[in-house]
Amino acid sequence: MFSAQNKIHKDKGVAPTEFEERVAQAFFDLENTNQELKSDLKDLYINQAVSMDIAGNRKAVVIYVPFRLRKAFRKIHSRLVRELEKKFSGNDVIFVATRRIMRPPKKGSAVQRPRNRTLTSVHEAMLEDVAYPAEIVGKRTRYRVDGTKIMKVYLEPKERNNTEYKLETMVGVYRKLTGKDVVFEYPVADP
């Protein structure tokens, strides 16, 4: 019969961790108990789940979903996040699509690498995933006097009430995933 094991597909030969099994079980329970999510969750599964400690005594649950299923997850994102945050006692839940980064081709090699496999492209796509459901409406890179870079990301003001409470978590998760500093802001509307 169906079980929580069907909700997590890892690479060959890798067993899921205890935390990943808890997340898969939460997905399975939601599919069986929540009628409005049942049909949407039927064919969905995850690749990996990680619990991250964020500064300020907060925790985040980062769930990696297959790249091909990210659109299906985005359709039910707000309802799914709300239910999973209840199950994980207030931890912020963030969905990120699994993407691969390829090395640059060697000199003299005729091999081309796709744009979506470059480090820059993968990091930009991760930024969009972390900021979802808010859309990114602008970016500024600020270079400090000491040479460090910080990226300011402006989010869609319409989604402010859905994302404002987890801005710190989004900053911490993006820093842990990519090693880059980022600040999320909402653009000030001109009166």
From Swiss-Prot:
GO CC annotation terms, alphabetical: 90S preribosome; cytosolic small ribosomal subunit; small-subunit processome
Any one GO biological process: ribosomal small subunit biogenesis
Name of protein: Small ribosomal subunit protein eS7
Keywords from the UniProt entry: Acetylation, Ribonucleoprotein, Ribosomal protein
Similarity field: Belongs to the eukaryotic ribosomal protein eS7 family.
A single MF term (Gene Ontology): mRNA binding
Organism: Brassica oleracea
Gene behind the chain: RPS7
PROSITE patterns linked to this entry: RIBOSOMAL_S7E
